[in-house]
């Protein structure tokens, strides 16, 4: 009845990151950290999980002798996000049907 949700995106922080990246061309680590209220360590771990899944690309470079990490969503990430949204909508549709039957 219920389809399994993408375990990579079914994490609050990873879903927040993908939601941010889908609306921008690219985002710096500090911007993502600020918008998600994540700690640097936790965010770094979650970004690596998204990267390993092929959902984002991470670019590390130096700007004025300071490290600069930026991220952008991949086509795979966009497709995964769109499917995740569809799957959640399907969940809600099933729940609505079940609730309607109970009335």
Predicted segments with their positions:
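N-terminal helix-turn-helix DNA-binding core of bacterial DNA-binding proteins
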Residues: 2-42, 61, 68-72
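Basic, amphipathic "hinge/linker" alpha-helix immediately C-terminal to the N-terminal HTH DNA-binding motif
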Residues: 63-85
């Amino acid at each position: 009845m219920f389809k399994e949700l993408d375990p990579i995106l079914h994490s609050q922080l990873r879903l927040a990151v993908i939601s941010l990246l889908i609306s921008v061309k690219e985002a710096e680590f500090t911007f993502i950290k600020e918008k998600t209220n994540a700690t640097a360590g936790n965010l770094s771990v979650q970004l690596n999980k998204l990267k390993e899944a092929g959902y984002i690309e991470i670019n590390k470079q130096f700007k004025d002798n300071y490290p600069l990490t930026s991220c952008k969503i991949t086509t795979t990430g966009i497709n995964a996000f769109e499917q995740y949204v569809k799957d959640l909508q399907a969940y809600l549709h099933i729940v609505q049907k079940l609730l309607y039957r109970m009335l």
